[in-house]
Amino acid sequence: MKKYSLILIFISIVIGVSFLPNVYGQDDISKAITKKNANPIVYHLTSNDPWRASIVISDATNLKNLGYNVTLLLSIEGVQVGVKNPHHHLNLDNVVANVTNFIKDGGKVVVCGVCLEVAGFEPNDIIEGAIIGTAEITPKLFTNATVVTY
């Protein structure tokens, strides 16, 4: 009988403790503060490969939608996904549409100006809402930033 009483007490304690609030969890307010104060994230895309570019844009969009400060930096061959009409043989129309949507939804896109010129494009060829990276703008992107390069 004593055994059953101890088991019953133990089960009662376990059930009772399970209803206590988790002091290690985050509520919505603390999650929002964490994201707001988090370091900025820069996705640096150097490739015009549609698969690689799609992954970058998907990741950047998901983090932006979660509230993080995300910038997409396009350089070298990656500038192709930041222009209105990339070279047709690259088949980047869907990727360019996703970058356009990223910008429309509040994402920031910076296109390397030198890389743009080397690729044969003019500043007015970039997607609406994107900006040309300059010596003043680009270094500021990296201040306290987490950089993910593809």
Spell out what each predicted region is.
Residues 1-4:
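Positively charged n-region of N-terminal signal peptides that target proteins for export
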Residues 8-18:
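Bacterial N-terminal signal peptides
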